[in-house]
Amino acid sequence: MFLTQPFCQVLCSLIHVNTCDLESYQFDEQPVMEPLPDRSSPPEPRPDPTAVGAGYDFSDQDSSLAPYYLQTHHIIAVFLVGFGFTLGTMFYLWHTDIWGHMRYVQWMHENHRIPDGEPFSPWWDGRQPFTQFYTISQLGLYYVYVAGERLAGGDDVSRMAGGVEMLRVLHGIFTALRFTILIAAFLRFGRSWPVALLGLVAVLLLDLSNLAVLRPQIFGQVFCALLLLAISRDVVSRRALVGLPVMFAVWANTHGSYLIGFILLVLLLVGRIYELATLTGKPWRDYQVQRLALVVALSLTAAGTLNPYGPSYYQRTLALGNHPSLLTAVGEWKSLTFEWAPGWHWILLLSLIVIAATVTTSRRSVPPAHVLILILFGIGAGLQTRMVIWWAMLVPWVLIPHWVDLARRFEPYTLLPPGIPSLRKTMLAVVVALAAFMWSTPAGWVIDGKPSAFEDAVSPGTPWRLARQLKHPEEPDAAWLPELATILQKNYPDRRFSGSILATPMQGDYLMWALAPDIPVTYTHIHLFHPDFW
């Protein structure tokens, strides 16, 4: 009892203290839970975005600017076209197939007429007729070169560098232009952006080795692409009835490849007639047959009359293509040799494999006209190497409808879903185009204020130092070969060379531009001489 009473007093005092503390403590209020929103009611409309510029909403796909927004395939197309431009500007200017052409225009500029004979070779005897096939392309090349010279200014080497740089820019522009037209032709023929882009990649792979050389042929390639664009419709349009004859008249005065266009049109016409004759027996009632026949007739008339030589122009063109000296001495005029070494024969074999794989797996039949095109141009590519250039554009064009059929059969695996047009993709395409320009050689001219050095812009085989030393022996900086300077000083008055230069056709092209006719250069244009001359 003595121990129990004090213990109870202590325990009661503790309970009394804790109870007072609990009574004096103020508890926080419980949080109030807001009711959940009613999902059954429509959401409140968002405020309209602030308009930018002249009242345009760049984030609205239904705005008036939406039709001008680009999609993913447009970005890829810009990349491929920009790649073609950049690549064309980065290639060396070749030492052949360019300088001699510009020299003829220089002569025409000085004499105000087209030459009726070889003006630079004293050995031309007239037995082989002189024909000016390249007037328009030569004029274009020469005046672009002159514009580059004037833009660069400075001494003669600096002006030469400016002229070469402008020619490289022209090469890039024509490459990009041809790629753009081919995309349009493939898109019109197959109505599929992915397949059209695939067709351009095929052209690029088949024609890659030819892209490196700037020559009048690039004009003909652009005309061929325009022809493919015109004939990619189900029926040739009325505008093409006027435009194609005009184009053939210009093409005939630009490059001898205009015959390729005529062959293509005739094969399409013959194939269409045969196809309808077997089906209906009345091919001439078909609009496509009528318009193709009219285009062929008008184009033959235009090209055969609007040239310096009249209808004999066709015979002159065929004679050039069968010149024995060209067929035996120039590599690209020879037939393909099938060997293990690298060459264009591999391009032909690879394309034949692709053709066989495509036509055997496609559900579409091959029209007779396309069969004729593949057979005739395939044989032509085997007999003459330079035909591979046209084969590279025609094969993808013929196969486009079959690739579209295969893509539709395996669409989940081959075709991406269509992209949504957007301003961001449009801006990305602009960035890609700007990047292509910044990688090109003219961007260096814009940034540095001067073109690429002449020796860096022309091929190593260009004998420009030799020509400059022969033309300016008195200048110390022109003395490229000390041995030649010693010989000129010892054996020639005023150190000026007199006589003729025996050069290969490749080397003679630039020497003719720089030295002829003051110093005659032999063996430059071998097609101007009778075979027994050699």
Residue ranges of each PLM-predicted region?
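Juxtamembrane membrane-water interface segments that cap and precede transmembrane helices
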Residues: 122, 132-142, 153-160, 315-346
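Transmembrane-helix motifs of polytopic, lipid-linked glycan transferases
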Residues: 169-190
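Membrane-interface alpha helices of multi-pass inner-membrane proteins
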Residues: 204-208, 241-256, 299-303, 375-381
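Short acidic/glycine- and proline-prone juxtamembrane loop motifs at membrane-interface regions
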Residues: 211-219
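Membrane-interface transmembrane helices that cradle and orient dolichyl/undecaprenyl
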Residues: 225-241, 355-362
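Short hydrophobic alpha-helices at membrane interfaces in multi-pass membrane enzymes
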Residues: 233-249, 291-295, 368-375
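Membrane-proximal, lumen/periplasm-facing interface regions of secretory-pathway glyco-
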Residues: 414-493, 508
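Short periplasmic/luminal acceptor-recognition loop of GT-C membrane glycosyltransferases, typified by
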Residues: 482, 486-531
